[in-house]
Amino acid sequence: MHKELSGKKEELIDYFINEALTFNLKHNIFIRANKEEVLNKDILDCLPLVEKIKTKEKILDLGSGGGFPGIVLAILRPDSEIHLLEKSQKKCYFLNKTKDALKLKNVSVLKTTINQKNTLEKYSVITARAFSSIKNILDLTKNNLKENGRYLLLKGRAEKIEEEITAI
């Protein structure tokens, strides 16, 4: 198991996975079928971001969906403030239900879309996973990144990343 996943944090991650799978049975918020898939393809995918988060960061997670990486970051970095941006009502319901069940006082769920003229705050970190192209994310959030802030984007295959970076 990863060093970040131990003790109380491991219990919270386990509870989160179980809640996500149960909710997913009726509401189809992601494509994983079992706990092992969620752990191996979602939770472990988010862990490299955790190491890049400093203490007391203000983080915006775009298109939070099933809580990856936003809820995972909130559990593993409880001293950081996490804003989960999601446009889907059912996904916001799930995120709020999960936040309350896990007593994540560092999480706010924002039910909204984002555009270039948004009035969101400034963040030290902006994350996204399967939200949009790198170029589109940069265009939509350029006014929301603090000076010396950074993007932590989970984008998948190297070929796709190279293609998106070339398009910028």
Predicted features, each with a name:
Residues 20, 73, 155:
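Residue-level signal for inorganic ion chemistry
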Residues 62-64:
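Conserved beta-strand/loop positions that form the S-adenosyl-L-methionine
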